[in-house]
């Protein structure tokens, strides 16, 4: 991706460009793994990426499916390293629009240090809606485990859910790195 495209895609809240760089790196790694499995992979159109939360289309023996790829994340901006235990789930994005959980992707691919855990989105929605206390909003990101959280000055609505619980309760498969 060119520097010009990077600037176009960078969110105004991503002041350093770190978020877009991390996300693009995860997408490139996902592509490499898919290609190593001899799968056909196609980039979503920019509009699909932004409005439908679809990054890629993958064709395998089951057919073609869409995926939204999520890079490893820190639980808090103050953390120095990304971690693999807790997954940030987005109900609403920073503009207050539909978050990626309710986007049009068939699957969500969560990057970890060792793999991508690829989860059926419908089963993820069902699980998250069942375990997150939507009536309990917290002020700090460190308290967002199974509770809703909004960042100051933004319209997003987020929560954190344990990846191990997602794997226990949602349809998924794993691609090793």
Regions inferred by a protein language model and the residue ranges of each:
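Non-catalytic C-terminal interaction segments of nucleic acid-processing enzymes
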Residues: 6, 15-18, 113-177
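Short connector loops at helix/strand junctions that flank enzyme active sites
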Residues: 51-53, 62-66, 84, 102-105
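Beta-rich nucleic-acid/ligand-interaction surfaces
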Residues: 46-57
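Generic preference for hydrophobic/aromatic residues in regular secondary structure cores
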Residues: 36-44, 67, 76-96, 116, ...
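Conserved catalytic cores of phosphodiester-cleaving nucleases, focusing on short active-site segments
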Residues: 34, 56-77
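Catalytic cores of nucleic-acid endonucleases
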Residues: 9-17, 43-44, 71-122
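Acidic-basic catalytic patches of nuclease active cores, encompassing PD-(D/E)XK
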Residues: 1-48, 73, 80
